[in-house]
UniProtKB/Swiss-Prot annotation:
Hydrolyzes the pyrophosphate bond of UDP-2,3-diacylglucosamine to yield 2,3-diacylglucosamine 1-phosphate (lipid X) and UMP by catalyzing the attack of water at the alpha-P atom. Involved in the biosynthesis of lipid A, a phosphorylated glycolipid that anchors the lipopolysaccharide to the outer membrane of the cell. Binds 2 Mn(2+) ions per subunit in a binuclear metal center. Its cofactor is Mn(2+). GO terms for cellular component: cytoplasm; extrinsic component of plasma membrane. Mn(2+) 2 binds at residues 41, 79, 114, 195. The keyword Membrane applies. Keywords: Cell inner membrane, Cell membrane, Hydrolase, Lipid A biosynthesis, Lipid biosynthesis, Lipid metabolism, Manganese, Membrane, Metal-binding. This is UDP-2,3-diacylglucosamine hydrolase. Pathway: Glycolipid biosynthesis; lipid IV(A) biosynthesis; lipid IV(A) from (3R)-3-hydroxytetradecanoyl-[acyl-carrier-protein] and UDP-N-acetyl-alpha-D-glucosamine: step 4/6. It is a peripheral membrane protein. InterPro entries: Calcineurin-like_PHP_ApaH, LpxH-like, Metallo-depent_PP-like, UDP-diacylglucosamine_Hdrlase.
């Protein structure tokens, strides 16, 4: 058996091929797993569990079917869907996890996270993140009418796209010191995350020992997952 990890699907109605690929994954590979972990940015945007978007209901039902089949499903918030709440988690049968979680997997201690907190060189993003994660601001935003939230979210996405276009790729990648610090804080030799859309397996030194950072790919033209078994940790790409 295996434990599966995915991230950065950025599901939206404008990308039906990705949605179809995810549904096939849920109906196939995911049903064979010991557990499924979604490490953020499942959706391109999330403005509240009360959004009646049919795509959200469709995804909730599909994930719930996996959970009901006996495969526990877990979710860590990303930078796009950090407002996903308890209502959607309940409807989809997912367990919400904190932004950093250590798992004991087949004899390995593995730290999992979305990954945006590791991009400490991007000071502008980190300042923005600190603001939008304030509970009072989230409560205020979620109390606004849905049409207002949609407008604000659209404006924020446009601003983010414009800001990122002028940033270097290095700034938007993880900071190596932040990676080592997180792994040593949790005393782990394995880290799995998404966010950067740069799938790879990186070797490093943490806790004065060899360590590994596995980065999930985004679902653009193909799927990406990390498959952890008793024998191996594999980064796998597959057609939709």
């Amino acid at each position: 058996m295996a434990t599966l990890f995915i991230a950065d699907l950025h599901l939206c109605v404008e990308e039906p091929a990705i949605t179809a690929g995810f549904l096939r994954f849920l109906a196939g590979e995911a049903r064979k797993a010991d557990a499924l972990y979604i490490l953020g940015d499942l959706f391109e945007a999330w403005i509240g569990d009360d959004d009646p978007n049919p795509l959200h209901r469709q995804m909730a039902a599909a994930i719930k079917a996996v959970s009901d089949s006996g495969v526990p499903c877990y979710f860590i918030h990303g930078n796009r869907d950090f407002l996903l709440g308890k209502r959607f988690a309940r409807e989809s049968g997912m367990t919400l996890l904190p932004e950093e979680k250590v798992l004991e997997l087949y004899g390995r201690r593995v730290l999992i996270m979305h990954g945006d907190t590791l991009c400490t060189d991007d000071a502008g993003y980190q300042a923005f993140r600190a603001k939008v994660h304030k509970p009072w601001l989230q409560t205020l935003f979620l109390a606004l009418p849905l049409f207002v939230r949609k407008r604000i979210a659209a404006r924020m996405r446009a601003n983010s796209k414009e800001a990122n276009s002028s940033k270097s790729l290095a700034i938007m990648d993880v900071n190596q010191n932040a990676v080592v610090s997180a792994m040593e804080k949790h005393q782990v030799q394995w880290l799995i995350h998404g966010h950067t859309h740069r799938p790879a397996v990186h070797e490093l030194i943490a806790n004065q020992q060899p360590a590994f950072r596995v980065v999930l790919g985004a679902w653009h033209t193909e799927g990406s997952m990390v498959k952890v078994t008793a024998d191996d940790v594999e980064l796998i790409h597959f057609p939709f």
